[in-house]
Amino acid sequence: MSFDFIKDRDKKVHFIGIGGISMSGLAAVLLNSGYKVSGSDFKESEILKKLRLSGADIYIGHSEKNIKDVDLVVYTAAIPENNPELIYAKENNIDLMNRAEFLGNIMKGHKYNVAISGAHGKTTCTSMLSNITLKANLDPTILVGGELDIIGGNFRIGSSDYFITEACEYKRSFLSFFPYVGVILNIDADHLDYYKDIDEITETFGQFADLIPNDGYLIGYIGDSRVKEILSKAKCNTLSYGFENADVTARNITFNEKGCASFDVYKHNDKLFDLTLSNPGEHNILNALSSICVSLIFDVNYDDIICGLSECKGAHKRFEYKGEVNGVTVIDDYAHHPVEIKATLNTSKKIPHNKTFCVFQPHTYTRTKTLFDEFTDAFFDADEVVLMDIYAAREKDTGLVSSNDLGVALRAKGVKCTNVHSHDEALEYLKNSAKPNDLLLTVGAGDVVIVGEKYLNQGK
């Protein structure tokens, strides 16, 4: 079916899994546009409370009773086929649309759609580009997979033709989009519960590039060989970025005491400007370059680019400073893939401190199993790893892999690693181990952040 964002405002739309960061953003867009919205999720959250206050009917738990008076049901790729609401909608011919198709239909109403894809960095790049376009008064609509202070959440309703969103490759979701500008930050082995291998993933990114019209643009990181190949085959305009041999490059790079980079931005051999980022880490130089490329396509003033990037605080859970207690600094990061973990720990090295305690919570059994060897090589920059049980998310424990297995493998490679089985057990270990001027990182896409929050609240 199709959905017309302008003409279908008399419809009531129900979201299965409305508490998710992307689904809640879509629901909020509809609520702000006058739609009747309902949704269900398996547990209460701050996101659900906000949606209630905005007028949504929220149900805790999934039941066919929740959708008896709705016109359209939207669901995510993570919703299982045996979900009672999904079954009822199919049996009773209620219109169904997955999240990606629904977002794609909303995008149809905009001319300058920017879809930011890649295994890592999507939210940060979207955050940077959001800052720039807001500084430039482009008045974009924004949907992002994280909370941004500058827009007060994970969405913004604009009144222009500019639409900025993340584009996830999971279950080929981004193939439902209509990009005018497509960004490929990187390609990596992930979501192997769905894809056969990295070659199939790369093929899907190539299909994403093919969605861009001939007068549109594909932007990609030249240092990733798979992205480089897709750029070379693109039928649309292309713009590459990287540290060398790219259209847009960063040169003369230095880092300050907070781990934030200063560098000169060049297009070919012409220096455009210099800037200092407020987001730490070498990987954020690349994220910044990707957002600069988009900005150049839209002829954004250099001063707005510089201001947008220098003031960008990034999204929550992206190397997010949470606080300090007893001289121990606590930082939370969403990293859940070995490449991301390495980047996070590398960033931490640029900040003056004594020991780094990395509290890591593996995310899904499939990812832990398929990338097991890569995980065992991801923690060498941590002084100590506190390893929590695997966060199941959408999966069930098959008994094929556990955090204990990962702990054994890490210790065999010389990593100091302690397995814990609850937030409180992790907290007690850290209270007895962390000392003034140490750095405590909570790392993962589950609920590991609770450990850091409890650590900061000790004694209160």
UniProtKB/Swiss-Prot annotation:
One term under GO cellular component: cytoplasm
Pathway named in the protein's UniProt entry: Cell wall biogenesis; peptidoglycan biosynthesis
Protein's recorded name: UDP-N-acetylmuramate--L-alanine ligase
UniProt lineage: Bacteria, Bacillati, Bacillota, Clostridia, Eubacteriales
MF GO annotations: ATP binding; UDP-N-acetylmuramate-L-alanine ligase activity
EC number of this enzyme: 6.3.2.8
Cited PANTHER family: UDP-N-ACETYLMURAMATE--L-ALANINE LIGASE, UDP-N-ACETYLMURAMATE--L-ALANINE LIGASE-RELATED
Keywords carried by this UniProt record: ATP-binding, Cell cycle, Cell division, Cell shape, Cell wall biogenesis/degradation, Cytoplasm, Ligase, Nucleotide-binding, Peptidoglycan synthesis
Primary role: Cell wall formation.
Main location: cytoplasm
Catalytic activity line of the entry: UDP-N-acetyl-alpha-D-muramate + L-alanine + ATP = UDP-N-acetyl-alpha-D-muramoyl-L-alanine + ADP + phosphate + H(+)
Gene label: murC
Ligand binding (ATP): 118-124
Organism: Clostridium botulinum (strain Alaska E43 / Type E3)
GO biological process: one example: cell wall organization
InterPro entries for this protein: Mur-like_cat_sf (IPR036565), Mur_ligase_C (IPR004101), Mur_ligase_C_dom_sf (IPR036615), Mur_ligase_cen (IPR013221), Mur_ligase_N (IPR000713), MurCDEF_pg_biosynth (IPR050061), UDP-N-AcMur_Ala_ligase_MurC (IPR005758)
Subcellular localization: Cytoplasm
SUPFAM superfamilies to which the protein is assigned, alphabetical: MurCD N-terminal domain (SSF51984), MurD-like peptide ligases, catalytic domain (SSF53623), MurD-like peptide ligases, peptide-binding domain (SSF53244)
Family: Belongs to the MurCDEF family.
